[in-house]
Amino acid sequence: FSVFVKKYPDCAAICGNGQPRLATLLLLDFLKENHSFYYHGDFDPEGLLIAQRLKERYGERLRLWNYRADWYERYLSDVNLSEVRMKKLEKVYLPELLEVKMQMQKRKRAAYQEAMLDMLEPEKNEWITRSVK
C-alpha cells in the first residue's frame, strides 16, 4: 500500500488491513454519496467474502478491481487452503466473484495482493489512469 501511494500521490487510497473496521466503514459511508470506490484485496476465501460484503453494502458505488481468474492464476501463492477455509467459499455467491471462486475451488491455493503490486499501477489500468489525472 505504501509503495502505491508514494508512487501515485494524486490517487486517493484507503488501506483497511483485512476485515474492514468500523472507522473504515464509517469513512466509506460518509464518502459514498459523492464518490465511487475501487476495491482490491486478497484472493483467498476471506478476501472474497470481504469483497462480497463491501459490494453488498456499497452497491454500484463499489467496483471490484480485477477479480478475474487470470489474475488469480497469475499470482497463485504456495499457500494451500485448509478444508476449513475452503468451506467458506460456499458463502460466496456474488456473480463478479464466481470466476475466481471456481478456480480457487480447483486449485485450493490463495493469491495475495502484495504479489499483484506490479499490476496495480495506473498506467496499466486505464480506469485508474482516468481517476488519477
Where are these regions (language model features)?
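Long, charged alpha-helical interface segments
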Residues: 79-133
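Switch/connector loops and helix/strand junctions flanking conserved nucleotide-binding motifs
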Residues: 47-50, 74
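Short, aromatic/basic amphipathic alpha-helical patches
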Residues: 50-56
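Short, flexible loop segments at boundaries between secondary-structure elements
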Residues: 66-82
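Acidic beta-strand-to-loop metal/phosphate-binding motif
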Residues: 35-44
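Long, hydrophilic "mature protein body" segments
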Residues: 36-37, 59, 69-72, 85-86
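Structural alpha-beta junctions
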Residues: 57-63
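Acidic, glycine-rich catalytic loops of TOPRIM or P-loop NTPase phosphate-binding modules used
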Residues: 1-33, 46, 63-71
